[in-house]
Every structure is written in C-alpha cells, then in structure tokens.
C-alpha cells in the first residue's frame, strides 16, 4: 500500500481567532443643522469615520443629502406630506451646516389628490434665482365645480388647460426669479405660489389643491462660506439647559430632631 498524505486531515490554522472590533468605536457623531428659515434647526445626527491619515472626517460629510419631513422642521403635523432635502455644505466643529436641496410630496398625499370627475393640470419650468441657483419647479392643480353648479363633472377644455398652464409658468418664473433661494423656500412653506396661481386662474376655470409639488436643484453656484453663514446665523439661541432656582420653601433648612436616649 502506497504511503502518502491524507488529504482528509485538515491542517490547524495558524494563530488564534481575531478579536471582534466594534465598527462604531472608530466613528464620531455629528449634529445636522437646518437653515434658519425653519423653526427647528436640529435635524438629527449622522455618523462618519474618524480622521485617519489622508481621510478627513469633514470631507466625508460634505455633500451628504438628508431627507426630512417638514412637519419635524416646522413643528406642525399639517405639513407632514412635504419632504425637504438638505445637503451638507460645511462642517463647523461638531455641526454639519446644510442648505436646501429640493422638495417633494409623499406618495400617499399625491394619490389622495387624484380623483374622478375633475381635470388634473401640471406644469414645470426652469428658473434661476438672484443668487444663481437653477431650479426646476413642478406645479399641480385640479379643477373644481363652480358655485351653484348642478353637473357632477368639472372637466376643463383643452384651450382652458393651455391658458392655465401658461399662467402657472408665468407666476412660477416671476416669483422665483425675483428672490434668492432663502426667500423662495420661505414661499414654499405656506404655499404662497399655489394661492397666487389659484387666484390668477379664477377667471379661466376655478381650481383647487394647487401646489408646488416638487423642486429640483439643477445647478448650484460656487460654495461661499459667507452666504452659508448668513443662511444659518448663529447658534447662541439654541435649546440648551438653564439653571433652575429652587423655591424658597424648599431651601428652608430643617432643624435636626433630638434623639432621646442618644
């Protein structure tokens, strides 16, 4: 019988088992800050690997995009159907300073708006703000029945739809091109542009549920730290702990009781 190596016998591994390293031990938490146009500026926290060699932590944070509900930013549940996108532009200490980077509707809100017996009208336009941001605005609107109308349906004619769409584009261009990004976002929150469109198209066909449903930023200007700090302001008025004075009755020193037999 030939004597040779038995392949079935497994060789012992060199060295012992490697220690399991917690991946979070090499990471740091940073606070995500929203612009000052929103009521609540503390969006949340984000993780990033610590600075090691040529890999700098702040560089790994820049240009991250966070999606936040407007209800959380404004403290108003009526705005829960709006999603705001914020992009990290700079890191100051442990704060990640973000800029507005888009807006969208939740799917359930859009589905709830679409109904039968009415006409859906949509329009979109590319605009440039005074601070050189190029945006694409998407508008949505629905026809409604006139006062004292008996007929169930409220369908608009093709010529009326074209007129309404033209009005939508004109108003969106006028409102967006006359202000900077900060002021434009302030118009999105209370739906000021939608109300303006609804008022302007009243003579063509009455509309309801007029919204700027989506905003995309196509092109942003070169990064300017001064402008970013103007958008964010200072953080001296943040929600921090304050000293609480004890009431006078609690501060009264209790007299020690005499123990009999001591």
Swiss-Prot record:
GO terms for molecular function: mRNA binding; structural constituent of ribosome. Residues 1-21 are annotated as: Disordered. Disulfide bonds: none annotated. GO terms for cellular component: cytosol; cytosolic ribosome; cytosolic small ribosomal subunit; plasmodesma. It is found in: Cytoplasm. Signal peptide: none annotated. Residues 1-18 have a biased composition (Basic residues). Coiled coil: none annotated. GO terms for biological process: translation. Keywords: Cytoplasm, Ribonucleoprotein, Ribosomal protein. Its main location: cytoplasm. Component of the small ribosomal subunit. Mature ribosomes consist of a small (40S) and a large (60S) subunit. The 40S subunit contains about 33 different proteins and 1 molecule of RNA (18S). The 60S subunit contains about 49 different proteins and 3 molecules of RNA (25S, 5.8S and 5S). Belongs to the eukaryotic ribosomal protein eS1 family. PANTHER family: 40S RIBOSOMAL PROTEIN S3A (PTHR11830). This is Small ribosomal subunit protein eS1z. The gene is RPS3AA.
């Amino acid at each position: 019988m030939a004597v040779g190596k038995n392949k079935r016998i497994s060789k012992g591994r060199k060295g012992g088992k490697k220690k399991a390293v917690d991946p979070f031990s090499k990471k740091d938490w940073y606070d995500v800050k929203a612009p000052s146009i929103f009521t609540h500026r503390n969006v949340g926290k984000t993780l990033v690997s610590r600075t090691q060699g040529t890999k700098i932590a702040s560089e790994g944070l820049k240009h991250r995009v966070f999606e936040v509900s407007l209800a959380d930013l404004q403290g108003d549940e009526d705005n829960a159907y709006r999603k705001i996108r914020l992009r990290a532009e700079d890191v100051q200490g442990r704060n990640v300073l973000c800029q507005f980077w888009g807006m969208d509707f939740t799917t359930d809100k859009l589905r709830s708006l679409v109904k039968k017996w009415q006409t859906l009208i949509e329009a979109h336009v590319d605009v440039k703000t005074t601070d050189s941001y190029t945006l694409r605005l998407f508008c949505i609107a629905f026809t409604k029945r006139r006062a004292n109308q008996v007929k169930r349906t409220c369908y608009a004619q093709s010529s009326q739809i074209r007129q309404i769409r033209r009005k939508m584009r004109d108003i969106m261009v006028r409102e967006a091109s006359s202000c900077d990004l900060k002021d434009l976002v302030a118009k999105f929150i209370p739906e000021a542009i939608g109300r303006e469109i609804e008022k302007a198209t009243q003579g063509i066909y009455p509309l309801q549920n007029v919204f700027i449903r989506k905003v995309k930023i196509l092109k942003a200007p070169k990064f300017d730290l001064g402008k970013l700090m103007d958008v964010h302001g200072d953080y001296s008025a943040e929600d921090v702990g304050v000293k609480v004075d004890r009431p006078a009755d609690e501060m009264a020193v209790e007299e020690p009781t005499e123990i009999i037999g001591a």
